[in-house]
Amino acid sequence: MDYTVLSIQELHDLYVAGKTNPVEVVEQAIAKAKADKNNALEAVMYDDARKMAMQLVNEGIEEDNLLWGIPYFIKDNFSTKGVETTASSNILKGYVPHFDAEVITRLKAKKAIPLGKATLDELAMGGSGMSGHLGRTYNPFDETHQHMVGGSSAGSASLVAAGIVPFSLGSDTGDSVRKPASYAGLVGFKPTWGRISRYGLYPFTPSLDAVGYFTRNVFDAALLLDTLAGRDDKDLTSSFREVDQYSAYQADVKGLKFATLKGISNSIVNPVLKQHYNRSIEELVKRGATVEMVEIDQNLLNALFSTYFVLSCAESTSNNANLDGVKFGARQAGKTYIDVIKNTRTAGFSALIKRRFILGSYSLKQENQELLFRRAQKARRLIVEAVNKVLTDYDFIYLPAAPGIAPKFDQKSDNLNIAHLVEDNHLVIGNLAGLPSITLPLCIDRGMPIGVNITGRAFDEKRLFAAAAVVESITGLKNLYVGSKK
């Protein structure tokens, strides 16, 4: 039996029944990872994983710990003690952290078993899975390797969709977990800003960054938040808010109100997506929910991408100033200290990263701050106010997670058409407003998945999972992986 395609709950039940054990499961996962052709791995931790699995078997099962012995992969922008962490950038080659990220510490305490590090777009900047220093990461649902899996959490999505592990860690700054989840038939979740500690997560845009993860069903996503949520004094932005038992949600939408945004839901072009999206709304209403179309100022929707882009370029320029070849990572020789920095950054960053840093530096120059950076901050505030106004009257915002199936690599372009930018980038609402947001599979088109997204009120993750579980029951697309029945 192939145990690695099972969910966390299913695998745990087999452990309890004595039908398999972590040693067997880890060996299966390692064998599948070695055979995988999707270029999803940055570094492996197989020896340590085998030792940990054997230790767990010798110690005996913890029946009340559902994460006991569950293998997973880590996006390579999380610090892993003693394991190279490059964030898929040449400039960080050779950097080996001396500490684990807080989320990894918590998962280790729960006896989950890390198998290795997953690929990403360089420094988590990008949405294609194309810009990492190891090249393209492929979508497991396309054996021809023509379709992208999305990014920046490309490898993390690919490894779960390929049926190698039940879950993986990612990070979400614009839609870097939730968009790949749509393309790969997965549940992709980001919590409220501050709900999960970011200690040990390499920063991209701190005012937008969130730890996220991929699972194959909604319950597993809620289960992980039970462990990962909560205050961490090492991360001063982590919240003191009380942690709920998220996996105890009741899958019910009776009396709940869903808003669809007119400027987005009315622009759906893909006929399969449109059909299934409308059907899901009808089914939600049958189950007692209210679903209504709401209008947000189109000018604010049109400003979503540009606002995100200006802010993210500016913050990332500042955050990555320490990558200078002096403190850690790769270093290029130079006659002077300035030459070392210049040569290191020139050789270490790709053209995409350099462009972002140039734009970020430009927007932060004193003479440009009011025109660009401050204006983007003001636009963000207006967007957040408009979204929160909607969520005052409604419990959730319900929208397609992507315009259609994963694009082909040769279709990737810098399409600056306003309608396209809104349709393709509206998930940044969750980051700009710091709201919990979840993507789950909605339909299959030409053998490729398309997801739907639900965004809720801040710190209302439990009800978000409850609503997502109902949508999951409507679509019937639970526990998807390549080769599963669709």
List PLM regions with ranges:
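Short, well-ordered alpha-helical
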Residues: 1-96, 101, 123-126, 237-240, ...
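Residue-level signal for the nucleotide or nucleotide-sugar donor/cofactor binding architecture
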Residues: 6, 44, 147, 154, ...
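Predominant activation on well-ordered alpha-helical scaffold segments within soluble catalytic domains
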Residues: 9-12, 27-30, 50, 54, ...
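Glycine-rich, small-residue loops and helix-cap segments
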Residues: 18, 29, 69, 109, ...
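A generic secondary-structure signal for well-formed alpha-helical elements
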Residues: 19, 33, 111-115, 228-232, ...
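Short glycine/serine-rich loop/turn segments
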Residues: 35, 68-211, 261-263, 314, ...
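Conserved hydrophobic/aromatic pocket- or pore-lining residues that grip, position, or stack substrates
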Residues: 49, 75, 107, 221, ...
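Structural helix-boundary/capping segments
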Residues: 162, 166-168, 173-267, 278-287, ...
